[in-house]
Design a protein with these regions (language model features):
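Long amphipathic alpha-helical scaffold segments
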Residues: 16-17, 21-30
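Catalytic cores of peptidoglycan-degrading enzymes
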Residues: 29-172
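Generic preference for well-ordered secondary structure
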Residues: 2-3, 21, 44, 76
């Protein structure tokens, strides 16, 4: 996959400028040096039972309370502190079948029903729920199915940076959740 392919995916959303504007298109944490990706989408080793399982998102390692940003415009459909595998987590509905999930947060500053804009700070990195270390678990869900988030990072990466993120994200490793 190249950034051109990700761009073509975004063009496949054509039919509505709003659809493109509101689809997730940026990384959910600052990753200027591209060193934050701890685990990518796909089959990974579970850190708890060491079995191979589908990892439905990407893990970004970061210090506690690193800001987490909304990947696009949307409405908060869940801001939950219940004790689940995701720990403290947020779900944003972006419309057009897109939902993003931000998990294992230390805290969040949004509530259900709130409208957010791309780049708004919505929470802070933590280690809650079924987690083996400080990180953000990030998922992109399209029409009810988890898809590889890296394909939606076309909004804030150069083609060279995109290639590097893609290279890092496909490496076989252990997820943090």
């Amino acid at each position: 996959f190249k950034q051109k392919t990700a761009y073509e995916i975004s063009l496949g959303l054509v039919g509505s400028e709003m659809c493109i504007r509101d689809s997730p298109s940026i990384q959910p944490i600052k990753n200027n040096d591209l060193t934050r990706i701890a685990s990518g989408f796909g089959m990974r080793t579970d850190p708890f039972d060491k079995s191979r399982k589908m990892h439905k998102g990407m893990d970004f390692s970061a210090p506690r309370n690193t800001p987490v940003y909304a990947a696009s415009n949307g409405i908060i459909v869940r801001a939950d502190s219940r004790s689940t595998g995701y720990g403290k987590h947020i779900r944003i509905d972006h419309g057009y079948g897109f939902v993003t999930l931000y998990a294992h947060l230390n805290s969040y500053n949004v509530k259900r029903g709130q409208t957010v804009k791309k780049g708004d700070i919505i929470g802070f990195v933590g280690n809650t729920g079924r987690s083996k270390g400080l990180h953000l678990h990030y998922e992109v869900i399209k029409d009810g199915r988890s898809v590889n988030p890296v394909n939606y990072f076309y909004g804030n990466l150069t083609p060279e940076e995109f290639d590097e993120v893609l290279r890092i994200s496909v490496q076989e490793n252990q997820s943090l959740d």
